[in-house]
């Protein structure tokens, strides 16, 4: 494999991993513990 191909595969897998982790954090079982700053703010 060429160096560019390995680099592209690494960056793509890293991006997919970060995206998957953020979706799991936002909608997973621990999402009930997250606070909403818009609801905390009073007008």
UniProtKB/Swiss-Prot annotation:
It is a single-pass membrane protein. One of its GO terms (cellular component) is chloroplast thylakoid membrane. The keyword Acyltransferase does not apply. InterPro entries: PSII_PsbN. Its main location: plastid. The chain crosses the membrane at residues 7-27. It is found in: Plastid, Chloroplast thylakoid membrane. The keyword NADP does not apply. Keywords: Chloroplast, Membrane, Plastid, Thylakoid, Transmembrane, Transmembrane helix. May play a role in photosystem I and II biogenesis. Belongs to the PsbN family. This is Protein PsbN. It comes from Rhodomonas salina. The gene is psbN.
């Amino acid at each position: 494999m060429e160096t560019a191909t390995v680099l592209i595969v690494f960056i793509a897998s890293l991006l997919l991993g970060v995206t998957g982790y953020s979706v799991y954090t936002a909608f997973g079982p621990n999402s009930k513990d997250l606070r909403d700053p818009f609801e905390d703010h009073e007008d």
